Amino acid sequence: MVFSFLITIQEAKSLIDSYYEERLDHMSDDERIEEADKVSSRIAESLSERAFSFSPNEYISIHRKLFQGIYKHAGNIRDYNITKKEWVLDGATVMYGSASELRATFEYDFSQEKNFSYKYLSMDEIIHHLAVFISNLWQIHIFGEGNTRTTAVFFIKYLRILGFSATNDIFAENAWYFRNALVRANYTNLQKGIHETTEYLEVFLRNLLLNEKNELHNRNLHISGLLNEEKVDIGNVKVDRCFQTSF
């Protein structure tokens, strides 16, 4: 009996995309904990460094330092498309950057921010702009994995050169909220009346930058709008261990 293993290029791409979509689900709890602990110490080291350059290379370098020896692709731009099922979107995915356009899109966002002037802006306007910038940068998802942690570290270091006393404390306490806020800033479904919004990210930033005490509950971000105060508060269920270190 002869079996044919010939598949089309499109079928091969679909298999590869499916692999990268599901790979994280196959990690054991011990593997996840080991990864988180290693990355946590590297985040602490990175945020203790005084050197920083606002550039694409700096962002890529942070990813490499955080995930060297953990991910084979550490510091490498992905060359495949990805999807990620999001709880906050009822299983839908954000449309991440196309693999063929990642470098160009990435560099464009950096050039736009580098040439932007914060002069004469109110604090509300500054926070809104920062929310738009960081959500756009995250949406590109230039790496296969580790984008949110890399974005958070880069963002903290960038905020510091802008004069803010940013620490990782709020990220440690609200890591899942931060990610869900980034997701909501990049998802639109007109048929369901859902529009991308930075409002949740701005609330997060107001706590971070202005020391406000706004409540950050993941249930408030869910697109169904059905999760209310009477249901279990899952706000801190998935706290990212990688941010459980203070600076």
Q: PLM features: residue spans?
A:
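FIC/Doc superfamily catalytic core
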Residues: 1-247
